[in-house]
Regions:
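PLP-dependent amino-acid enzyme catalytic core
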Residues: 1-321
Length: 321
């Protein structure tokens, strides 16, 4: 039985450096790429393209770091998670590295393409209804080590290596824009970046149609938000008390991006910068481009992933600006 990391966990600089050492050679140290504006480089906005990771998203960082620290006896049993997207694919990829079995519990409304994406990593797939999934999360079987992506604070260490790399590679950074869904990515980046440069501002970004953290921070309490049909569907997550406290402690604020701005950012990244980003990945650039330079200064945008449906991408590229 694996005991979850306590919700009081706040990684130190040493924790982030240890995580960086563990993931070296597995996760790519992604470069900081100047944003290209119509074939001219904009040195004031740098892109951190996590979509070039082996599984197409940043999640390999936190997942590998978590699995690597499991007791070998427990790890050999196998690993499991609840996810229809990047988390399950990252866990399947990492399980193959360690040579252990893996399982993905996927909601029955997930598109077949996402189910197949996890199956390609050799995962055992269990399709469940939402009530069944909630029961599984509350009482996971002991046959596999269960990674609860909604509550495992140990993910902060691995995800935070992004913030470490940003400040090591661009120490003059003034502002980092990062998507905020569950909260572990944005808070991990903030904790690591501020450990090296306390004055750096880290701004989380929500979609206007799914403003969970934005509204909850405004009201100073959890504000339930109905799931929305947003291009940034990968960060269409509910806000919990623990995660609201974490985000409030670590981020300098959360801003909103409209669907039009997200769409424009996806198109701009693909056409001008040759980078394919999902909506949740492009949302950081959408926010940065909507913020005057005087307010943001030297900027880094974390592009968290590239898992976008090809047909959706095609529609965006064909649509008018």
């Amino acid at each position: 039985m694996i005991i979850p990391t306590p919700n009081s966990h706040r990684p130190t600089l040493e924790d982030f450096r240890e995580a960086a050492y563990r993931v070296k050679g597995v996760a790519i140290r992604t470069p900081l790429v100047p944003l290209r504006r119509y074939r001219e480089e904009d040195q004031k906005i740098l892109l951190k393209p996590e979509m070039i990771q082996p599984v197409g998203s940043y999640k390999i960082r936190g997942v590998y770091n978590w699995v690597a620290q499991l007791p070998e006896k427990e790890r050999k049993k196998g690993v499991s998670t609840v996810s229809a997207g990047n988390m399950s694919q990252a866990l399947g990829y990492v399980a193959n590295i360690f040579g252990v079995p893996s399982r993905a519990i996927i909601p029955d409304y997930a598109p077949e393409t996402k189910i197949e994406a996890s199956r390609r990593y050799g995962m055992d797939i269990l399709v469940m209804t939402l009530p069944e999934i909630y029961e599984y999360i509350e009482n996971p079987p002991d046959d596999y080590c269960f990674l609860n992506g909604l509550e495992e604070f140990g993910l902060l260490d691995g995800h935070g290596t992004i913030g470490l790399e940003i400040m090591e590679d661009a120490p003059d950074t003034d502002t980092i824009f990062v998507p905020v869904g569950i909260g572990f990515l944005s808070s991990g980046v903030a904790l690591a970046a501020k450990a090296l440069k306390p004055s750096v501002r880290v701004i989380g970004v929500n979609a206007e149609l799914s403003p969970g953290f934005y509204e909850s921070l405004r009201e100073n309490k959890v504000v339930p938000v109905e799931p929305a049909n947003t291009l940034a569907d990968a960060i269409n997550d509910p806000v919990s008390e623990d995660m609201l406290k974490l985000v409030e402690e670590t981020l300098d604020g959360v801003v909103l991006a409209s669907e039009d701005k997200i769409r424009d950012a996806i198109r701009f990244l693909a056409v001008e910068n040759k980078l394919v980003a999902e909506g949740a990945g492009a949302i950081s650039l959408a926010a940065a481009l909507s913020t005057p330079f005087e307010e943001r200064g030297n900027t880094v945008c974390v592009l968290s992933g590239g898992s976008i449906d090809p047909e959706k991408l095609s529609q965006i590229l064909r649509s008018e600006k």
